[in-house]
Amino acid sequence: MRLSVVALLALCSALNAGDVPGLVKEKPASGPCVQVDGQYMVPYTVTIPGTDVKFEMIPVPGGEFLMGSPDSEPGHQPTEGPQIRVKTRPFWMQKTEISWADYKPYMALYNVFKKFETENIRPVTDEKMIDAITAPTELYEPTFTFEFGESPDLPAVSMTLYAARQYTKWISIVSGQQYRVPTEAEWEYAARAGSDSAYSNGDDPAKLGEMAWFADNSQGKGPRKVTAGKPNAFGLIDMHGNVAEWVQDELSEDGYAKLKDKAAAGPLSVFDVMGKPAVHYPRVVKGGSWQSTAEECRSAARLGSNYALWKDTDPNLPKSPWWMTDEPCRGIGFRVLRSIDELPRDQIETFWNVDSEDLKLDVDGRILGGRGGYGIVDQDLPEAIRKFKSGEK
């Protein structure tokens, strides 16, 4: 039976009272776990429906932390202050960055959706648009994107924030669990893993190489396998370096100044910090990459996206909403997060869909020009793809 976004949200709510991936009633004898609401969050494995691709989700405890960096921290930038106290509920975060193995099934949907459109299979009507996504068109210059390889265990890179968000909508609906990109506060909390230092393993940049793959040790060789690094105290790999990671927040020139008065009354929620992003760019990218200096890999470091530069050599008009063509794009990826508390429909859609007028114009322009398209996502999609490829009716 087809599962829509509405049904997904209802299912997720119902499952919270029963058998849910990553939640158990008894405390495990070993391994990481987080007690919450009389149950225990534990690691679990996601298998992308219709594939044999798997990735692991790790429970992260809730808590409070000081977000941003003090003026005295080497590498501090004005947009990292003033520091504010933030609280977060527990969540699961992907253990590694999204790999090409994880991302390519989503990339493959572009040709699937175009063929479905030609054959009038699973047509996208107005009433079904709530369940629709776009899939990334084929790469303009794959030799550039894949210069350092496209091995399944290398991190997927050069996708836009919009593409990352559409990926999370797809995997949420086909899997029956609600995934999204992290807020910046959630990401930084997970990266710090209980630390208040510049890096999760201290303040000394000379020791960063123990955990991170960045300019000093990558030597321009490109990213490493997503499982190659040493986990932080929460069990997450490469929160510093390898590839920088998209988060949902926009970047303001005054940093967290607009939140200072509100934060004086007590810790802010991660959604208070995020606000309501409404600009196409700059959006925040966190963690630094194999191209970055140690200071650019700090937990508090913030990189603002600049699509005017990062898509400079894209010859298309409008430029691709799904891919970037210029550095530092080969050092940018993402990882997914799942909240312990499912978000209501109107809120989760802000994490999944178009959220700025400029982006809407780009997406609409590409689709009207025949260089993009929509497809319906539900739990029947993997079987529909299988039947189509095998010639079954």
Report residues per predicted region:
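Bacterial N-terminal signal peptides
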Residues: 4-14
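Surface-exposed recognition segments
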Residues: 18-19, 78-84, 195, 243-378, ...
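Active-site microenvironments of metalloenzymes and redox enzymes
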Residues: 18-25, 69-75, 87-201, 249-253, ...
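Primarily auto-inhibitory N-terminal propeptides
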Residues: 18-46
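Short aromatic-glycine motifs in intrinsically disordered, low-complexity regions
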Residues: 41-55, 142, 324
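Mature N-terminal segment immediately following signal peptide/propeptide cleavage
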Residues: 50-67
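Well-ordered beta-strand positions in beta-sheet-rich domains
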Residues: 57, 64, 83-85, 90
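Functional-site microenvironments in short loops/helix caps that host divalent-cation chemistry
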Residues: 66, 70-71, 141-307
